[in-house]
Design a protein with these regions (language model features):
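Conserved, hydrophobic alpha-helical core segments of structured domains
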Residues: 1-121
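Charged substrate- and nucleic-acid-binding regions of tRNA-handling and nucleotidyl-transfer enzymes
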Residues: 2, 107-170
């Protein structure tokens, strides 16, 4: 639809939110195995999402489901991180899995391949396999553990747990 100049103008007049259509060119260059990993909602995200929250208006206007809106929110919220070299490390992917989920990390990785020139498709496949096989990290310290070591239940315990978790994540 976006290859023909006339149809592109018509579509953009009707749906001005689909302003990132050039990202679809990158998907067309992928092999079939990688292309098949993109579902309709992720392709729609590629057309709509940037670092702004314009996706919210799109979701409201077209009455998308909460799951689509949450998926868009996750991608938009991490948009700036997608542009860094550090994003494509296994360590960062593992952190994303801990903070959100394997599906969210997978969506971000697939989305990033179309908005960033910093990764090769071979590395994408490797990282997608890593996401699939990676065990979800579990924070090793609990409130019970801290209570055994002298902390009393309450606000102080919660602050200490949060502080330890932030250091563990970093």
């Amino acid at each position: 639809l976006f290859d023909n100049n006339q149809s592109k103008k018509i579509i953009l007049n009707i749906f001005p939110e689909l302003k990132y259509y050039e990202r679809l060119n990158k998907i067309n260059s992928f092999d079939k195995k990688l292309k098949d990993k993109y579902d309709n909602h992720l392709i729609l995200a590629l057309l709509v999402i940037d670092q702004s929250n314009d996706y919210e208006y799109f979701c409201h206007k077209y009455k998308t489901s909460n799951s689509i809106e949450n998926r868009f929110k996750n991608i938009s919220g991490n948009f700036e991180n997608l542009k860094t070299d550090k994003f494509f490390s296994e360590e960062n992917i593992k952190k994303l899995i801990y903070l959100s989920s394997k599906d969210d990390a997978r969506n971000l990785l697939l989305f990033s391949t179309c908005v960033s020139d910093k990764i090769e498709t071979l590395n994408v496949e490797k990282l997608l396999n890593y996401i699939k096989s990676c065990e979800i990290p579990k924070f090793p310290i609990s409130g019970d553990y801290l209570k055994k070591h002298g902390y009393e239940t309450g606000h102080e315990l919660g602050k200490k747990l949060k502080s330890l978790e932030e250091k563990w994540i970093a």
